[in-house]
């Protein structure tokens, strides 16, 4: 069973709900990718997510754009998940520096900003 479901699409988070531990977390984007004609109303999907005790719902695309690039949406999601991962925030920051370091300091800074933006949604 899963400790967390991390999803860039809210309906997808519900698809994997049977695998989530009773005390697990769902961290999901609030904006759906509507790719089927009978996609349920967004409000209904989010209402189902909200039934899970431990949930975080955020508008990943808007936050990523505010940070400076829609390409960092996945790092925004990671930031929102950090309080529940059991890994120190500093270790995650170091991982980002390591992974993106070869792309230059500007890319590292952008991703660290995205990480913090995601985390700040949870720490409000």
Residue ranges and their predicted role:
Residues 1-124:
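Active-site cofactor/cluster-binding pocket
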